[in-house]
Design a protein with these regions (language model features):
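Conserved active-site beta-strand-loop modules that form the wall/rim of enzyme catalytic pockets
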Residues: 116, 135-143, 147-151, 179-180, ...
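Canonical P-loop GTPase G-domain recognition
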Residues: 84, 91-144
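Well-ordered alpha-helical segments embedded in enzymatic catalytic cores
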Residues: 70-73, 126, 259
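Signal for well-folded cores of large energy- and translation-related assemblies
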Residues: 60, 75-79, 93, 100-105, ...
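Helix-rich effector regions associated with P-loop NTPase G domains
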Residues: 2, 10-13, 18, 24-48, ...
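Phosphate-binding glycine-rich loops and their immediate beta-loop-alpha structural context
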Residues: 44-54, 58-112
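A conserved segment at the C-terminal end of the G1
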Residues: 146-162
Length: 276
């Protein structure tokens, strides 16, 4: 797994005709996992990166539009892995970041915004400082600007950048494999291929709520043993969503509850032996 620290014996000089072998994988501090949520392999886990400190969730504010439910998945995965999440909003010259910031800053998630300018990327220095000395993993769906950020942070990386399809609104996969590069400011920066989904069905149902700090607080008002599933009587999550005074607030809250319940259902289904 990328990020693993291993013990090696033999000739590690790298010279021709030398031989060395790995004898041990050291204990992992963190482990980012991704799981399948559909078909026969639902719930199966795949390790992505080991021993990383930061999960840098890169999200475009426009072109392509942001996907809050994808961000929610990454937050659940980050907390499950033992990593700190960092939300980096790109293309803030195309759309106002206020709405997304109002969703995630109150949850204690650090959020940074960047803008492409004629002289470079505005805001990149703050991102650089946040990543300095740490092992950071950049994730996000295609077209959000991960490779552009990598190239700004580590020019020697020379990652290929792409554009968003105007018809589908989706980015083209320019990164097809994980690449770890040394951060000039200390640590490592790991670029991951753009994805259109990130399964978290491997996360235990009780732990899914950790990715929704706002809902976790509300859930304390639920009756003992409440599963928080759709249709459960007296679930405080429904009451919280319904009692919002303004329609826009009600819509936002309903969206948060629905996002949580989708991930909760996937987790419960994956852990149900009768559905294997």
């Amino acid at each position: 797994v990328v990020g693993d620290q291993v013990a090696v014996v033999g000739d590690v000089s790298g010279r021709k005709d030398t031989l060395a072998r790995m004898v041990r994988i050291e204990p992992r501090r963190t482990l980012l996992l991704r799981s399948a949520e559909d078909g026969d392999s639902a719930g199966s886990q795949k390790p992505v990166v080991a021993n990383a400190d930061l999960l840098v969730v890169v999200t475009a504010l426009a072109d392509p539009p942001p996907r809050p439910r994808m961000i929610d998945r990454y937050l659940v995965a980050a907390y499950d892995a033992g990593m700190e999440p960092l939300l980096v909003l790109t293309k803030s010259d195309l759309a106002d970041p206020t709405e997304l910031l109002s969703l995630y800053q109150p949850l204690g998630v650090r959020c940074l915004a960047t803008t492409i300018t004629e002289s470079g990327i505005s805001g990149i220095e703050v991102v650089r400082q946040a990543l300095a000395g740490k092992v950071s993993v950049l994730v996000g769906h295609s077209g959000v600007g991960k490779s552009t950020l990598i190239n700004a942070l580590v020019p020697a990386a020379n990652r290929v950048t792409g554009h968003v399809n105007e018809v589908t609104g989706r980015g083209r996969h320019t990164s097809t494999n994980l690449q770890a590069v040394v951060n000039p400011d200390g640590g490592w920066v790991i670029d991951t291929p753009g994805v259109r989904s990130f399964g978290v069905a491997h996360v235990a149902a009780d732990d899914v709520l950790r990715g929704f700090a706002d809902l976790a607080q509300v859930a304390q008002e639920c009756p003992r043993g409440c599963s928080h599933e759709p249709g459960v009587i007296d679930c405080a999550l429904d009451q919280w969503a319904d009692k919002a005074d303004e329609a826009s607030t009600r819509e936002t809250r309903c969206g948060r509850v629905d996002s949580f319940r989708r991930l909760l259902t996937a987790s419960l289904d994956a852990q149900d032996p009768t559905k294997a």
